């Protein structure tokens, strides 16, 4: 018999060798039908896993992230099986679950047109109706290679050969006639994939490397309820309209050219947006007691060896040789910040020391992974490093969370907090880890905030808080991080003199609030659908004279608004006023000021507000005061 601890701490006795699926069935048919996977002693497993020792068991449904991944991973197998049934010559590459869905890469000459995708979907529905059980089995590497070679799956053979020689068995899942190289977990049978949709097809290089063959990637999503699928597809259509790559082009914000894949060009409107965002960042950080530094973009190899990046991150770094010495363009700002701290001695009276840096970093990403501003090869990280004593830790964490609250609320973004704890591969004393982790939890709890635990997902040098932002479409974006670090101060031998006159090692917080300026611009562009709040809009006011004879008055109004600090332009083209209004609406200008005979005679302007339309004639000074108050309060509308 085995003792299994269930949800709520209840311990029940079961027969040795019982599967998680059988446990779920014993607890109720509702749970059994909803089960997608399980977690045994914190490790995600297949529901068919036999339990032969005392353990803690969690049954995972689609409401759990790992449950979603299991169901969507199974959906990717159903997709691959359908393609192989219809096109036996297709070669399979990889097909993981991803955020909000799944994909599968195929090497096939047949183009996956919308008509072909419909045909594949129909075959998938047949496979779902067949309720094929997913059965896990293992082979020695040699047997696995033989099986895949026999099936002509050259990409699978390549993957297996990478694991051969490690002394590990190779796991497969079988559903009907289909065998797939996979570690799992999966739902019990294909009938659980109740609601799914193939959403698009794109090209993707094998392993994301442009030197490799271009494959066809089919994207899809899957849910347990049709209603949830329909809601998601509606959101997806709205997201397409808000795509920051599309809006970036239409609004003149940024572009990415063939001459620099992954290296964004910011255009005039984009620079106004970017600089306004950075000005706000600086204003907030000054109020919260931060000083700002700037460290070189390129530093020599010895620094990166000392920080550990040369050994653990070199494949993502751009390197060069200067005067026979290896240099690297910085992928992170931290090591430079350590050197600044070490420039002068510090006393406990100097701490906490909060140092911010808007540092341009470069990281090599595979070409297949690049995506607008969301995944680039160079970006500005809004870093800060806080050097403190152990007893200042909780107060500093709270201070950072308060700063995050202020910044995110300005953009109308809510968040969820995730606490990532000590991984198996970690450095440092476990007592220090326990203290740091409990301090993180206590700080957010005392502030009345909820959090979830992400067991074992901390960095090797310390636990962290991750802030997952929710946008206007309900999508989540991981932007803010508060990362405790007990190791980098040790590597760089950072010190301060304590009240006892002795040398002590400070503790450090790495933190970012926006994460990457470029990525955050992408996020808020989609969040606001390009209709930025007045304070953030690249062009705040557009003056529209009805005809040429009102141009002089329009230019006078423009000068007055410009002197008051508003970002304003005049549309002097000889076009009908309706055309000018429609174009300003397409450009998502917050305010249009219409000028005709009546406005010139009365010294007023007729105001059209984005989203509201005509709000009437007002005096220029009155409009300026209202707009400046709106900007100062950073209102969202």
For each predicted feature, which ranges?
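NTP/phosphate- and nucleic-acid-binding module
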Residues: 1-73, 78-93, 98-637
């Amino acid at each position: 018999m085995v003792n299994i601890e269930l949800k709520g701490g209840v311990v029940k006795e079961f027969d040795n060798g019982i599967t998680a699926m059988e446990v779920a069935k014993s607890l109720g048919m509702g749970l059994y039908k909803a089960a997608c996977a399980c977690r045994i002693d914190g490790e995600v497993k297949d529901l068919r896993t036999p339990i032969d020792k005392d353990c803690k068991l969690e049954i995972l449904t689609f409401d759990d992230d790992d449950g979603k991944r299991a169901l969507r991973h199974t959906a990717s197998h159903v997709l691959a099986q359908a393609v192989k049934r219809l096109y036996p010559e297709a070669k399979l590459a990889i097909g993981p679950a991803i955020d909000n869905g799944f994909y599968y890469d195929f090497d096939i000459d047949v183009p996956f047109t919308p008509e072909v995708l419909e045909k594949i979907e129909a075959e998938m529905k047949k496979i779902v109706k067949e309720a094929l059980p997913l059965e896990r089995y293992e082979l020695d590497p040699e047997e696995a290679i033989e099986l895949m070679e026999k099936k002509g799956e050259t990409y699978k053979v390549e993957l297996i050969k990478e694991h051969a020689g490690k002394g590990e068995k190779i796991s497969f899942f079988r559903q009907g006639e289909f065998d797939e190289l996979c570690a799992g977990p999966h739902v019990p049978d294909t009938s659980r994939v109740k609601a799914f949709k193939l959403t698009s097809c794109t090209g993707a290089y094998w392993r994301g490397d442009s030197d490799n063959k271009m494959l066809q990637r089919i994207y899809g999503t899957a849910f347990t309820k049709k209603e949830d699928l329909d809601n998601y597809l509606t959101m997806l259509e709205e997201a397409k309209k808000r795509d920051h790559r599309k809006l970036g082009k239409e609004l003149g914000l940024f572009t990415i050219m063939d001459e620099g894949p992954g290296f964004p060009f910011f255009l005039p409107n984009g620079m106004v947006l970017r600089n306004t965002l950075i000005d706000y960042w600086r204003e907030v950080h000054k109020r919260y007691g931060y000083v700002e530094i700037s460290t070189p973009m390129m530093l020599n190899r010895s620094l990166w060896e000392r920080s550990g990046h040369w050994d653990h991150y070199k494949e993502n770094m751009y390197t060069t040789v200067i005067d026979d010495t290896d240099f690297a363009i910085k992928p992170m700002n931290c090591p430079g910040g350590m050197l600044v701290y070490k420039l002068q001695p510090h006393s406990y009276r100097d701490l906490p020391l909060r140092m911010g840096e808007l540092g341009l970093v470069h990281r090599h990403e595979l070409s297949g992974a690049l995506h607008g501003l969301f995944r680039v090869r160079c970006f500005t990280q809004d870093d800060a490093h806080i050097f403190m004593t152990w007893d200042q830790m909780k107060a500093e964490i709270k201070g950072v969370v308060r700063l995050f609250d202020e910044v995110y609320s300005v953009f109308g973004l809510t968040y969820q907090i995730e606490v990532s704890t000590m991984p198996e591969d970690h450095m440092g004393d476990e007592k220090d880890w326990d203290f740091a982790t409990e301090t993180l939890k206590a700080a957010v709890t005392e502030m009345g905030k909820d959090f979830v635990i992400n067991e074992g997902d901390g960095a090797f040098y310390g636990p962290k808080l991750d802030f997952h932002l929710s946008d206007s479409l309900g999508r989540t974006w991981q932007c803010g991080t508060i990362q405790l670090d007990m190791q980098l101060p040790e590597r760089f031998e950072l010190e301060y003199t304590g009240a006892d006159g002795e040398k002590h090692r400070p503790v450090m917080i790495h933190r970012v609030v926006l994460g990457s300026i470029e990525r955050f611009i992408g996020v808020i562009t989609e969040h606001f659908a390009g209709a930025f709040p007045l304070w953030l809009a690249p062009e705040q006011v557009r003056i529209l004279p009805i005809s040429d004879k009102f141009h002089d008055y329009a230019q006078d109004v423009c000068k007055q608004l410009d002197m008051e600090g508003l970002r304003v332009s005049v549309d002097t083209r000889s076009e009908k006023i309706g055309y000018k209004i429609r174009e300003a609406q397409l450009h998502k200008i917050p305010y249009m000021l219409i000028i005709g005979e009546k406005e010139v005679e009365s010294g007023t302007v007729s105001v059209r507000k984005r989203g509201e339309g005509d709000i009437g004639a007002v005096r220029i000074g009155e409009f300026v005061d209202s707009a400046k108050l709106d900007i100062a309060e950073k209102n969202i509308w």
